[in-house]
Each structure stands twice: as structure tokens, then as C-alpha cells.
A protein has these predicted regions:
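Disulfide-rich extracellular modules and peptides
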Residues: 135-136
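Active-site recognition of the HExxH zinc-binding catalytic motif
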Residues: 76-89
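Post-HExxH zinc-binding segment in Zn-dependent metallohydrolases
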Residues: 97-132
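Short, solvent-exposed loop/turn segments at secondary-structure junctions
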Residues: 32-35, 68-69, 83-84
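Auxiliary, metal-adjacent structural segments of Zn-dependent hydrolase domains
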Residues: 1-61, 114, 124
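Short pre-active-site segment immediately N-terminal to the catalytic Zn-binding motif
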Residues: 61-78
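Substrate-binding clefts and substrate-entry loops adjacent to catalytic sites
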Residues: 64, 86-94, 114
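Stable alpha-helical elements in mature extracytoplasmic
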Residues: 4, 8, 74, 78, ...
Length: 139
């Protein structure tokens, strides 16, 4: 994992404004059910809905225990969580946690295109909803 994170830090340092001169975060592989409990505080959600988490209280990235470094999308999930780690350790300020997604999704998309020639066309409306501090269901 150390070599993978080093490579991703090099890519992020070259392609973003992030300072990547930081220690590597801890990366844990965890069963999906445990990830759901940790994030949602229950286990009543789609079984595969969480692809990764970043716990800023202890600089830890959590990935499903079946994470596969050979899969371009799964590699991009690790990159996405590394973006959150770098936002944290670089002291970036956000109005809310969701606002951290404004950088992570486009960077993940760019990584997939540049490295794997993979077109990830995520739903832009969904992106606006999950990266905004306002409640999209309460006008």
C-alpha cells in the first residue's frame, strides 16, 4: 500500500494544488457491514453503497475489505479519500463536511481519464447536492 499511496501522492502533487509533503495516512480494509455501521451508525443501508471513508480524527482511510488495486475505479476511490486526507492535513477550512467533495469528485474524474482513459461521467446534479452545505430538500 505504501508504494500505491506514494504514486498517488506524486500524481496529486503534479495535477493539483495540494501540498503532498505529509506522512502517509493509515489505510484499513474493513467489511462493508462494519463500514456501514461506522458511517451510518446502523446497518440499514444499501450493502455496497460506501466505497471509502476518511476518518479525520485519526488520519485513517477505510476501504472495503474486497478493495482491488487492479480496478481503476477502486484505485480512484483511494485517490478520492487521499484528497480528503490532504484537505485535512493542509488545514483547509470548509463550512461543512460535504463541501470537501467539491474538490474530490472532479479530481477523481480527472485521474480516471488521465491514468486509465476511463470516462466517469457522474451525475452533476447529485454532485451539486452532495457538495453543498444547504439542505437540497428544504427550500
Amino acid at each position: 500500500m505504501k508504494e500505491i499511496i506514494t504514486w498517488l501522492f506524486i500524481w496529486l502533487g503534479t495535477n493539483t494544488y495540494f501540498n503532498t509533503n505529509h506522512p502517509h495516512p493509515t489505510v484499513l480494509l474493513m467489511p462493508q457491514e462494519e463500514m456501514n455501521r461506522l458511517y451510518y451508525q446502523d446497518n440499514d443501508h444499501e450493502p455496497d453503497s460506501l466505497h471509502g471513508l476518511y476518518d479525520k480524527s485519526n488520519d485513517t482511510i477505510i476501504l472495503p475489505d474486497d478493495w482491488n488495486k487492479e480496478d481503476p475505479f477502486e484505485m480512484s476511490v483511494l485517490l478520492h479519500e487521499l484528497v480528503h486526507y490532504l484537505q485535512d492535513v493542509n488545514g483547509m477550512k470548509f463550512k461543512c463536511t460535504r463541501e470537501m467533495e467539491k474538490d474530490a469528485w472532479p479530481i477523481q474524474q480527472s485521474f480516471l481519464k488521465q491514468v486509465y482513459n476511463y470516462d466517469w461521467n457522474y451525475d452533476k446534479l447529485w454532485y451539486l447536492m452532495i457538495s453543498s452545505c444547504s439542505d437540497p430538500f428544504n427550500f
